Amino acid sequence: MKKVSEIMAQDVVTADPSLPVPEAAKMMLKEDVGCLVVMRENKISGIVTDRDLLACMAQGHDIQKCSISNHMTSPVVSVPPDTLLINLAKVMAASQIKRVPIIDGGKLLGIISFSDIADDMDDQVADMWSEWLQLVAVTKTSAQHRRGRRFNKQNKSHARITH
């Protein structure tokens, strides 16, 4: 079983809690990320997602006056790097979250998304299918070879009878 440390993204985009919502949206767009980990004094104080920013606008807030601290999720669900992917997937499903920071000794090491886990599982499933197809091919070739030997024996036997 894989651990989160094996597939986590190590480049985490962080932001100060006072960052205005429009600046956060620009940062997410520029960095091509769906969330920012909000840090206060080198500690995680929250996480804000693109959906949180959309909700802020949809609720009619004056986004020029809103900071991300007003719309972030806190406290943050986080896990250590040795957490098994399957266990993290269960936590994410139970908590209904899509992104989880990876923390060790209070230090932010990375972040992992549900799609990272799904992509990795797709790779694992593809590998299993590949192995299975190879096994089927070997088994089929072996079975054809055995049938061929039987057919040859039957023909030789038949040939002896007719001569």
Predicted stretch roles:
Residues 7, 23-26, 39-41, 59-62:
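Short hydrophobic/aromatic-rich motifs at helix boundaries and adjacent loops
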Residues 14-32, 79-96, 103, 121:
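The conserved cystathionine-beta-synthase
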Residues 1-11, 49-78, 84-93, 113-163:
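Tandem CBS (Bateman) regulatory domains
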Residues 28-31, 36-51, 92, 100-115:
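A glycine-centered beta-loop-beta connector
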